[in-house]
Amino acid sequence: MSYSTRSISQSARFGVLASPGVNRARSVAGGASTVRMSSANVTSSAFGGSSAFAGSSAFAGSPAFNVSVTSNNGKETMQNLNDRLANYLDRVRSLEQANHELELKIREYLDKKAAVGSLDYSGYYNTINLLRSQINDATIDNTRLVLSIDNAKLAADDFKIKYESEMAIRTGAESDIVGLRRVLDELTLNKTDLELEIESLKEELIYLKKNHEEELAVVRSSARGNVDVQVDSAPPVDLAQIMADVRSQYESMMEKNRQELEACYKGQSENLNHEVATNTAALQTSKTAITDLKRTIQSLEIELQSLLSMKGALEGTLAETEAQYGAQLNHLQAMITQVEMELQNLRSDADHQSLEYKRLLDAKTRLEMEIATYRRLLEGEDTRFSQTETQKAVTIVSKEQSSSSIKKVKTVIEEVVDGKVVSSRVEELTETS
C-alpha cells in the first residue's frame, strides 16, 4: 500500500516533487484579480526511458512566475529518477546473471555429484566382504589355534607332573637299590669271613689230623719194641674218638652255619632280585613314558612354532589389510569432507545470492510501484490540475475583491493498492493575513 499526497498552496512557486510513496503536485498562487492559465503536456516513459515537461503557465498580475524554472526542475527530477531506475535495472540484470551462473554451477555440481554417487561400488563391496570373511576365518582359526596351544600346554603340564612323579619313584627305587647293594656287600663280606673261618677250621683240622697221625705213629713204633712197662695209671684216653667228636661237632656247626648263611643269602637274594626286577620293570616303563613324553613335547613344540609363525603371518596380513583400507577410508573421508565443505560454501553463496536477489527484487518492486504511481499521477495530473486551478482561481478572485489576504493549503491524500486508487480525501488548511 502506498500513499500519494498532493498539496496546493498559494505561494510564489510552481514545481513537481516525487518521493517513494508520497508525491506532491504543483502549487499555484495568484496575487491579481485576473488569472490566465495554459495546460501542460507531460510525456513519460518507464523502465529506463526519459520524461520531459513541455508547456508554459503564466499569471497576469503581481507577482509574475517563471514557468521555465519549474519545467527544468521537473526534467532534472525525472532524469534523476530515470538514472536511478536504470542503475537499479542494470544491477538487477547483473545480479540475475550472477544468480544464473551460480545456478548453473550448482546444477553442474549436483549433476557431477549424482554421477559420482551413481558409480557402481559393488566390486569394491564384494572385495570388502571377501576380505572381511577371510579376516573372520583367520580370526576363528587363530582362536582355534590358541585353544589348541592352551590344550597342548595343559597336556604338557600334566605330562610334566607325571614325569616328575615317575622321576621321584625312580629316585626312590634307585635309593632302595643302593641300600640293597650295601646290604648285599655286607652279606658278601660276611660270607667271605665265614668262608675264611671255614678254611681256617679246615686247616686246623688238617693240622690236628697230621698231629694225630704222627702221635699214632710214635705210639705204634714204641709198641713194636719189646718193652713191657706196666704203669699203674688211669685208663688211656681215646684221642681218636675225641678228635672224631670234635670233628663231628665242628662239621655240624659248619653245616648249620652254612645252611643258615645259604638260607639267609637265598632269601635276601630272592628279595633283592624281586625288587630289582620290579624296579627294573618300573624303570623301563618310566623310561618308555619319558621317551613318549619327550616325543610328544617335541611334536607339540614343533606344532606350536608352526602355529606361532602362522599367527605372525596372519597378524601381519591383517595389519597390512587394515592399514591399506584405513588409508583408503581416510582418503575417502577427506574427499567427503572436502565435497561437504564445497557444498556448504555453495549453499552459503546461494543463500547470500538469494538474499541479495530478494533484496534487489523488493527494491525493484518498490521502484516499479513508485514508477507506476508516478506515471499514474503524471497521466492524471492534467485533468486534476486544470479543475483545481479553475476552482482556486475563482476562490482567489473572490478573495482578492476584499481587502484581506488569505492563504489556503489543500492536501489530496490518495490510497493506492496494487497500482489502483482505492480511496481519496482532501485536507484544507486556511491561513488569513
Curated annotation (Swiss-Prot):
Region (Coil 2): 243-381
This protein's record includes keyword Coiled coil: yes
Region (Tail): 382-433
Record GO biological process: epithelial cell differentiation; intermediate filament organization
Additional information: There are two types of cytoskeletal and microfibrillar keratin: I (acidic; 40-55 kDa) and II (neutral to basic; 56-70 kDa).
PANTHER family registered for this protein in UniProt: INTERMEDIATE FILAMENT, KERATIN, TYPE I CYTOSKELETAL 47 KDA
Family: Belongs to the intermediate filament family.
Gene3D superfamilies in UniProt: 1.20.5.170, Single helix bin, Vasodilator-stimulated phosphoprotein
Species lineage: Eukaryota, Metazoa, Chordata, Craniata, Vertebrata
Organism of this sequence: Xenopus laevis
One Pfam assignment: Filament
UniProt region (Coil 1A), positions on chain: 74-109
Region feature (Linker 1): 110-127
A GO molecular-function descriptor: structural molecule activity
Alphabetized UniProt keyword annotations: Coiled coil, Intermediate filament, Keratin
Region (Linker 12): 220-242
Subunit structure: Heterotetramer of two type I and two type II keratins.
Name of protein: Keratin, type I cytoskeletal 47 kDa
Disulfide bonding pattern of the chain: none
Domain IF rod: 74-385
Coil 1B, as annotated region: 128-219
